[in-house]
Amino acid sequence: MKKIIYLLLLVTAFHTSCKKSSTEGGTETPTNPTTDLPAGAKDGVAFINNGTSAIVTLYAPGKTSVLLIGDFNNWSTTASIMKKTRDGNTWWIQIDNLNPSTEYAYQFYVDGKLKVADPYCEKVLDPDNDQYISAAVYPNLKAYPTGKTTGIVSVMQANQPIYTWKNNSFVRPEKNNLVIYELLIRDFTTEHTYASTLAKLDYLVNMGINAIELMPVNEFEGNLSWGYNPSFYFAADKYYGTKTALQNFIDECHGKGIAVIMDMVLNHSFGQSPMVQMYFDGSKPTANSPWFNVDAKHPFNVGYDFNHESAATKKFSKDVIKFWMQQYKIDGFRFDLSKGFTQTQSSGDDVFRKYDAGRVAIWKDYNSYIKSIDPNNFYVILEHFAEESEEKVLADDGMMLWNNLNYNMNEATMGWLTNSNFQWGFYANHGFSKSENLVSYGESHDEERLNFKNITYGNASGNYSIKGNLATSLKREELAAAFLFAIPGPKMIWQFGELGYDVNIDFNGRTGEKPIRWEYYSDPNRKALYNAYTKFIRLKKNNSIFNSTSSTYSLAGGIKYIKLVEGANTVIVVGNFDVVNQTANIDFGSSGTWVDASGTNISLNSNNYTASLAPGEYHIFSKVALR
């Protein structure tokens, strides 16, 4: 009898051990032990023992098993079983015998069926898109582990190349004096790299630009993208260059007096995100996702909508914010689709844009967190477009709001006057107490190029035609720019707007690559527009009157003017946006000599200025000569 019992025990033990030694196609998920996180652990990878060991963690509540696979265990799906914390939310493992100078590719193997990269990794390898990144753009890129795994893999390295910062005393421009240049690395130079963009930096410096707003540069899906389809938030997208190349770009900008603002997309993520993939039913996020809503809460969403009231989302977003502030020394964020940071359901913008106390609380919390990291004039810019009462609360908290003047300003440049009033550029019309909180622009990446519409749809009268006439359409751009830069507050330019870029936004698809037209700079008419921008920017930055809190204006009709008063000086910008001669009749406030920024003077016998202005003619008058 004892022999029979012993034999049964032996068979049972053998059968059990066979079940536990599953392979990648095994029949049973391995058992994961439960234990607390060790000291020094953090989300993602924490290196210890001088880089010869790493503690790797993954936040994945509700999962039954997680294994770590990678170069260090020959991608075995049985060798590195991760431990689970007692609350069941976080998985971790320590791996040893690493070479601190070696890059190791790795993934998480979740529930015996899903391989995902590390959401906190600083570099990924993409089997589909890396092949199109040249060695000139990204030297010595680690090869993808073909044949050993599938999907995007993360990369860890203890002794990463360390960038030594040179310009540590950079002082950010005051918000009111910001002249921001919105820039897409992909379409700025043919090489589409940080290095090639740096080679053009003096072009921006000479124009007077003091801030560059980079369209998204963290890892996004594919290579040829605007970047608003993010997948990995801590990894710089390799299509533009290496991590140190981006750090050097920012450092060199600081050395030239230029702040760098990063376009950050935390409203949503896309399907390559491991955070999406881990809680996904094949068509949408599942209800137990720690980060995402099953269905988007608002009508403007693309990708998968973050649940912005989730504690997990808030922690992740703050980790992303802190990382870029500290690792890359950026000077500000432009938060894409900030109005989407809501859990209030809406199906149309009439509801979506209404005052949302929950959304306000979310943004005040993030703004406070940013200030706790860097209180030194760090820029928080929102693409919000919500109800004015909500934007005022955010502005009063120190945040800056995008202000789109494209439609009305373009109507003015085309000479169609009915809807040409762009008084929305003045902060008081938003209820704001300070002009520094309103970032006004005539063009952005999202809007049609002014000069395309000038040439295609411009008005005409007699021998004066905007449509089809490049020289005239460019002068209309100059006219509008004189007014834009006279409005108090920070301003933004979309790349090549200063040269009258006139390629349709929908050419090659809205987000598709656009022709890079550096030859514009050699065209005398386009160069004249660049020179005019340079002049207007210089006037704005050198003369505090352009931030005056005392302003009057008339921006409807053909004759438009802006009047600014500061102390003993008055500036009046006047121009004719009609396509026929018009007579200006404006109260200048005093008689005597007035200085035209063109270099000539006029003398008034009374307070009134009366003059016939030709189509497109403008003047910048001041009582005291401007610098």
Residue map of PLM features:
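Bacterial Sec-dependent N-terminal signal peptides
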Residues: 1-4, 13-45
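Aromatic-rich carbohydrate-binding modules that target alpha-glucans
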Residues: 38, 47-50, 55-103, 111-132
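Substrate-binding/active-site clefts of carbohydrate-active enzymes
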Residues: 124-134, 138-143, 161-178, 184-358, ...
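C-terminal beta-strand-rich structural cap/linker in extracellular carbohydrate-active enzymes
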Residues: 66, 605-627
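Conserved alpha/beta catalytic core and glycan-binding cleft of carbohydrate-active enzymes
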Residues: 329, 356, 363-506, 541, ...
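Surface-exposed beta-strand/loop patches in extracellular or lumenal glycoproteins
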Residues: 53-62, 66, 577-591
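Aromatic- and carboxylate-lined catalytic core of secreted/periplasmic carbohydrate-active enzymes
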Residues: 488, 517-554, 615-617
